Regions:
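Short, acidic, small-residue-rich periplasmic hinge/interaction motif at the N-terminus
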Residues: 110-152
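Short acidic/polar hinge/loop motifs at secondary-structure boundaries
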Residues: 201-229
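Periplasmic-side early beta-strands and strand-to-turn transitions of outer-membrane beta-barrels
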Residues: 254-255, 263, 275, 279-370
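Membrane-embedded beta-barrel scaffold of Gram-negative outer-membrane proteins
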Residues: 397-401, 405-407, 566, 601-653, ...
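Gram-negative outer-membrane beta-barrel transporters
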Residues: 524-529, 621-636, 647-731, 834-838
Length: 839
């Protein structure tokens, strides 16, 4: 009993002592909080020396959370006294205390520049995976960072070539339509599976989901390109299915003047760029303009290599429109306020006639619609206004956006006169009757889309003690999309137009809205980072059907000074494009399969689940960094076109390994990457494949640059692609298959009315012919492996630069393909000479 009493008394004394210590600690913490706030008050009223002296005298005794604030205030004090050396010293101390410290838009610009400069000197940072800057080692998914210097060294002409050069798993596909890329074997007719952003602003169309990595996105304005290799719907919703590409522009201070460049090359290439950038106190401004045009390279296509096998002739590859592609824009930042405005125009000439017909056509014979020749033409306007402010311990940012696009798809269906094309396509009988017997059949679709949106997001950074720290991010977004002023036409005899009833044209009009909310937690404990996020999207389609999708993400990262290991899972979705759903409905309406009031919509969202394990190492050998990533993807309901309609017909289960490395030594730099991909399940149109389609199983790139002299820099790029498997539909056999299908249906109806042996025998024979024709509809071909080499050089003298780049220097002849088309010849040896001057 006595011992028990002693124990109780000891515990009581310990409790009293603990309470006293806690109270004392709280009192001490409050005292230091008062000291810091007094210093902050002195700084705000201009007594900078007093604030500096107070902070320095108590710096070692501040608790962890106050010490970070004190370092920040000491940097501001030193900058206020124009003592950059001391400011940099305390900025270094701040980042030593918290390597993941991030500035906010409310911070002075000089402070932001100093922190970013020091962080970039330690390791590269990106903002795409979160709303604040992160190092590559702490991002939750494998990420490729492409710098301005890497872009110059690649000999690339546009964003497509930059991505295919540096991003493991990304390759060029040619769908006889717009400029396009595939990510880990997944792609569509247009580039609609990858979210492309400009300074965080979505560039993908809301009607088609397309954002082509073409010449309407200039490279001269780019500071860096951040590429998330994997699903990212947990942050960006229903467009970021396979990857996210965020194009980050330079700031005005990076340019600090005016830069102009002009160039010309073979095949009618003309290129011009202008940059203006300045910083005036708290105002940073960047203005850019770029244009590019090319007449294209001619290739002769023999009859047997066409889809219709009706005519041979020349096609044009690499043609960029009657009007040049251009990119005009302005980025302004004043204190906490940011504004972006961008105008893009692109006009790409299709080498062949539409889709499975892929035949030469006489481009110059066809009439123009509103000045637009046969092409895929897009003119877009993007505007973004945002304001950020610290509210207590939370950084809040609000953004309003406006996007407008004029979309035109003007396709040649068939050049010579034929009834086969009209029989195959789902065109109403009365319209077929007008066009029957004429050559020069075409289709023209145009629409004006408008989208307004608003977004609110917040970031709360917390520090519990020296080992626990993190950030909680949250936000919500609303967007409203409307497609109006739709024009739909068929053309015949090259320059004649069919009058389409308004009842058909009006089927393309409509509007949709989307709401979403997300939350993301990033918690850092010792050498571990837990990154988890969840987003919910609610979409109201034009037909009042609802899309409800959850997009989770989870990553665990283990950090060491020279290496890191991360495991991640993410799920993404992309809703079926508005245009696809409307096209399906329009075809059904024209063929009298539905009435005008039927708003049925049969296309579902596409989904992708991805598991990734990544090992990255820095400076294991002097100058060498590398990353090895293994992935397993499960994609379902992938949409493909079957003649004129679209279906959720694709399933892809793929796995692979990606390797990337960079090395730098004195005047020599090298970047290399390689990807191997296998397929465990690939289904399309109820057909099974043991490989990916029109993308290589093995791909590799190497970019080497060497500064030969003080004024001369040389560069080269090697690109290897293994054998590729191509699949498309034979349009002639498809027409035969449809003919026998109609015959079978007629005989079935006859046999039901009159079941005699003669009709039964004819039905059985027709059924066999139908099956034989169906078996010949799928076409399988192969593309041989190949290696391409590019060379380039830059000579600089004072403010003058001269560049020469030669693509495919050995003039390698090869083909490429994509979905819904045959083999398309690719560019041979193209060169471009450019002259630039900095004012």
């Amino acid at each position: 009993m006595k011992r028990c009493c002693l124990v109780i008394l000891s515990l009581f004394n310990f409790f009293i002592a603990a309470m006293f210590m806690a109270a004392s600690a709280q009192t001490t913490s409050e005292q230091y909080r008062d000291i810091y706030e007094n210093a902050e008050q002195d700084y705000s009223i201009g007594r900078i020396e007093d604030a500096q002296a107070t902070l320095k005298s108590h710096l070692k005794n501040f608790p962890v959370n106050l010490r970070l604030s004190a370092y920040r205030m000491l940097v501001l004090c030193a900058l206020g006294l124009d003592n950059d050396q001391e400011a940099e010293y305390y900025a270094q101390q701040l980042l030593d205390e918290n390597p993941y410290y991030s500035t906010t838009a409310s911070d002075p610009q000089r402070f932001i520049d100093m922190i970013e400069s020091i962080k970039s000197g330690r390791t590269a940072t990106i903002t795409t995976t979160s709303s604040v800057a992160e190092t590559l080692s702490e991002v939750p998914v494998p990420t490729t960072l492409i710098t301005e210097e890497m872009i110059r060294n690649s000999c690339a002409r546009n964003l497509q070539e930059v991505l295919a050069t540096y991003v493991p798993g990304m390759s060029i596909v040619d769908c006889n339509d717009d400029i396009n890329v595939a990510m880990r074997g997944i792609y569509s007719n247009g580039q609609e599976k990858i979210l492309i952003m400009l300074n965080g602003h979505r560039l993908n169309s809301f009607a088609t989901n397309i954002a082509a990595p073409d010449f309407s996105i200039s490279l001269e304005k780019v500071k860096q390109i951040e590429v998330l290799r994997g699903p990212a719907s947990s942050l960006y919703g229903g467009v970021a299915l396979t990857a996210v590409v965020n194009v980050i522009t330079k700031q005005g201070i990076d340019v600090d003047g005016i830069t102009v460049r002009a160039g010309a090359g073979n095949y009618g290439q003309i290129k011009a760029d202008m940059l203006f950038g300045k910083r005036y106190f708290d105002l940073d401004m960047l203005v850019w303009g770029s244009l590019y045009r090319a007449k294209g390279q001619k290739f002769y296509i023999p009859l047997e290599e066409t889809g219709m096998q009706m005519t041979d002739g020349d096609i044009t590859v690499g043609g960029i429109g009657e009007k040049p592609s251009y990119d005009l824009g302005m980025q302004m930042k004043y204190k906490n306020l940011q504004f972006l405005y961008n105008v893009q125009f692109s006009q790409v000439i299709s080498p062949f006639t539409m889709s499975y017909t892929f035949s030469p056509y006489t481009f110059d014979k066809y009439t123009t619609y509103n000045g637009v020749p046969p092409s895929f033409t897009t003119r877009s306007n993007h505007a973004n206004l945002s304001y950020g402010q610290m509210v207590g311990n939370v950084y809040l940012k609000g953004t309003v956006t406006y996007d407008n696009s004029d979309l035109t798809h003007y396709q040649v269906l068939n050049d010579p006169e034929t009834s086969v094309m009209l029989d195959v396509l789902p065109i109403p009988t009365d319209i077929k009757g007008v066009m029957d017997g004429y050559p020069g059949i075409s289709r023209y679709v145009n629409g004006q889309e408008h989208t307004i949106g608003g977004k609110v997001q917040g970031d709360w950074t917390y520090i519990n003690n020296g080992t626990h720290q993190g950030q909680l991010s949250f936000g919500g977004e609303y967007s409203y999309f409307n497609l109006d002023d739709v024009e739909y036409n068929f053309g015949y005899d090259f320059n004649q137009r069919v009058i389409i009833p308004d009842s058909i044209i009006s089927q393309g009009q409509g509007h949709e809205s989307n709401m979403n909310g997300y939350v993301q937690l990033k918690h850092h404990w010792r050498s571990f980072i837990l990154n988890a996020g969840l987003r919910f999207d609610y979409k109201n389609r034009y037909d009042d059907t609802k899309i409800r999708e959850f997009s989770p993400r989870l990553a665990l990262i283990y950090l060491q000074p020279k290496w890191n290991l991360k495991f991640s899972y993410s799920k993404a979705f992309i809703d079926a494009p508005y245009l696809y759903r409307k096209t399906n409905r329009l075809v059904a309406f024209m063929m009298n399969l539905i009435n005008k009031d039927d708003e049925s919509d049969i296309l579902n969202p596409e989904t992708l689940h991805s598991f990734q394990l990544t090992l990255a190492a820095n400076q294991w050998l002097p100058g060498l960094n590398f990353e090895v990533n293994g992935f397993y993807n499960r994609a379902h309901d992938i949409i493909y076109q079957y003649v004129a309609q679209h279906y959720n017909t694709g399933t892809y289960h793929t796995y692979g390994v990606e390797l990337s490395a960079d090395y730098e030594h004195r005047r020599f730099t090298a970047h290399a990457n390689a990807t191997w991909q296998g397929v465990s399940k690939a289904e399309l149109f109820n057909l099974n494949f043991g490989h990916s389609l029109s993308t290589p199983d093995l791909a590799a790139n190497a970019v080497i640059a060497w500064k030969a002299t003080k004024n001369l820099k040389l560069r080269t790029h090697a690109d290897f692609k293994s054998r590729q498997h191509v699949f498309y539909l034979d349009i002639i056999n498809y027409g035969v298959y449809r003919m026998w299908g109609q015959k079978v249906q007629e005989l079935k109806e006859m046999y039901e009315e009159n079941p005699i042996p003669e009709i039964k025998e004819a039905l059985e024979e027709a059924t066999r012919y139908e099956a034989d024709a169906e078996a010949q509809v799928p076409v399988y071909k192969e593309i041989d492996s190949r290696v391409l080499f590019d060379l380039g050089a830059t000579w600089q003298w004072r403010n003058l630069t001269f560049d020469i780049d030669v693509k495919n220097i050995f003039n390698k002849q090869y083909t490429q393909s994509g979905v819904s088309t045959g083999l398309i010849p690719q560019r041979g040896r193209w060169f471009l000479l450019q002259l630039g001057y900095k004012f």
